[in-house]
Amino acid sequence: MKVLALLLALSGAARAGDRPSEDSLFGAPAASTAAAPAPGPAPEGRSRDEGRELTPGRSRDAFLSGEVANDALSIGGTFYQRWVVSKQEGQSAKNTPESMPLQFDAYMDARPNDRVRGYVQERILYDPTLDQYGNPTKGGGLGNLQYSSNSGAPSSLPAGTTSQTTSNPMAVLDQAWLKFDLDQAVFVTAGKQHVKWGVSRFWNPTDFLSTQRRDPLLPYDLRLGNTMVKLALPLEKYGTNVYAITLVDNPAPASTVGQLGEALRVEKLVGNAEMGAEALARGGAPPTFGADFSAPAGPFDVYAEAALFGGSPGPRYRLTGEPAAGEDVSSLYAASNPRGPFVQASGGARYDFPWMENRQATAGAEYFFNQLGYGGGSIYPVLIFTGSYRPFYTGRHYGALYLTAEGPDQFKHTSYTFSTLGNLSDGSFISRVDFSWRFLTYLTFEAYADEHYGTKGGEFNFELHTPALTNGGAPVPPINVPTTLYDVGLGLRLSF
């Protein structure tokens, strides 16, 4: 309750934290942001570190001397309330599942001078449609949608038991980092932070530094930060940036030195093309390599990224039988750990054009190849049951088409997005229409509707019906997950 009281007490206007641009993810008009002032040279006759020394025999005013900024602390946050209803096949209107995930972020941003910055962001999560343990009170429900758009198969299956592993509400730490420079040459960011790699819109195989994959159909990135120490070395003369990173909690918290991960990334501007290459080693696991580029090609912007995995990040599963009443779940599948290498690659093109005076639109297409994926949907129940299911990264081939446009009235700050994503391996699809309207300066209203279609049992048109089974001698009641026909969602977001 102390954390809750503290967060609710935080108010005021401030700058947003270092997050991936939600406009770049969702097609809204890009809002210009003021750049932080560049560090200036030390005053003539003074050393850069003179301000850190105390002058004997007299007091000094740190604010007048410029050592501490007058507005050193900023406070702000985000209130984000969503409401999602999913129409399921064969369900009456009164039994239609709903979810109302609430996210409240509060941050403190300290900038005592232009070379030091500290940032902390706490997050409260709550869903009034779930009980205190995060479970629906009736039926299968939609589960926890705090980090999900509910576009694919569920991440867990109803098993007739109550889980007490999640609290509702729940407070989590999103970001907590300190940033400073070493002689204005090397820039250090240490702590729990957001760092996203990759240039593709929907699928980012090179996004190595997060323990979660981004849901591309969410309005903006809701993932929590990860703890790391990042050293950035800009080489402006060569148009190059070099990043060296130590990972502390990816893929798991490092309780020993041997569990730490190390990553290196180099970015370079070559003509009009932006190129990047990275390498990653984590806790004795096989190394991972990646590369990406983006460049103009005539009227189009093209981009691509690829990752090479030295080994499979987890077991590979295959079915060994069909479920029969009373059978043990473990007898229905087998697991193996194949050796690499494995490749994931995505790429696409987009075309920007004016669709009316002062109104822009973007059309694009993207493809994703996933050698770590599966060729059909029959294995999905096993992946969900074992906790190995990864939405948008389970199939072998994916594709997407989209069109996003600014609304006709430039003073109403509206945007529309039409998108279709398909798991080409299992033949399931989802088509979606999104609307966004920013009003009263700080409020954003969101609405969307989507339709699931294609092969039943596929990722985007999932269904599952099983008889009563057992798991290690414990009974598992029959599971019935009907097909979701369509979803309707509303959202209200306040940024302050």
Mark where each language-model region is.
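Outer-membrane beta-barrel "beta-signal"
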Residues: 231, 401, 466-496
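Repeated loop/turn-to-beta-strand initiation elements of outer-membrane beta-barrel proteins
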Residues: 73, 114-118, 185-188, 237-242, ...
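Detector for outer-membrane/organellar transmembrane beta-barrel domains
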Residues: 296-423
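Transmembrane beta-strands of outer-membrane beta-barrel pores
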Residues: 81-87, 114, 124-128, 192-196, ...
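Residues that define the transmembrane beta-barrel architecture of outer-membrane proteins
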Residues: 98-102, 169-174, 223-227, 258-262, ...
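Outer membrane beta-barrel
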Residues: 101, 105-241, 247-249, 268, ...
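Residues on the lipid-exposed face of transmembrane beta-strands in outer-membrane beta-barrel proteins
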Residues: 81, 104-110, 175-180, 229-233, ...
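N-terminal periplasmic/intermembrane-space "pro-region" immediately following the signal or transit peptide
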Residues: 14-96, 107, 111, 115-117, ...
